[in-house]
Amino acid sequence: MLEKLETLVSQLKATSSRNDKVSILKSNSWSKEILLRIYNPDILYGVTSKKCKKLNDLDGLKSVDLYDFLTQLVSLSGHDCVRLVNQFVEDFGHEALVHAVVDKNLKCRIDDTVINLAFPGLIPTFNVALAKNYTDHADYVDDDWLASQKLDGVRLVV
């Protein structure tokens, strides 16, 4: 699985065209579940590659494959996460790729927008609705005003 993911990442790095990236992702439908686990902002891993490199003497937890590894990583925390990542790298290699997966960035210039173009609705997104000019829609603009509170640069989600 890691070899296939490494090939996919190298194909995505080889092109700068957004349409080419979408077509590459569509032709590799097996990557859908992996991309979901990597780029979903609701799935958090309790470790970063920096911590794993710093504590590279910790190991001992086993994983069978990449899916099992990512499932275990969600449920663990602290040094257990570091042990799992370091043992996975020791067992399967591909250190740079595994650390990129743990950091939730494959460094192939794709994001949730590109992934959702290839697989609609796969990665949940949250966008704040921007305001419109109220003078175009309000019928009370010509009334006299005493004061209006100004909220400069504030974005609120209500």
Predicted features along the sequence, with ranges:
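N-terminal nucleic-acid-engaging modules of covalent nucleotidyltransferase systems
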Residues: 1-158
